Amino acid sequence: MRIAREEIFGPVLVVIAYGDEHEAVRIANDSEYGLSGGVWSADEAHALAVARRVRTGTVTVNGAPVAFGGPFGGFKASGIGREYGAVDLGSYTEYKTITSDVPMGWRHRFDR
């Protein structure tokens, strides 16, 4: 489907039926672009496993906000490098940011 292969900027919602998870990942990855994507699931561990298979520079899980301290940039034709984060580790590395719906204040547990 053409709309699933193009890089669209704007308020657009695309809904495409798929048979199983493998087909959903195939549809998501069947594009020359890979800036951002999202995975929704009641099972967060499963959603994180699927997010690792989606070839985009940023993947949100269950609508989590973007991690502004993480590297920003895309894969494939969407990738012209990375901004933010410590990402100058090599030109052959594809960095991915995965965000999840972690409760606010989660960082404080490490301050002790």
Name each region found by the language model.
Residues M1-R112:
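Conserved C-terminal structural/oligomerization subdomain of aldehyde/semialdehyde dehydrogenase
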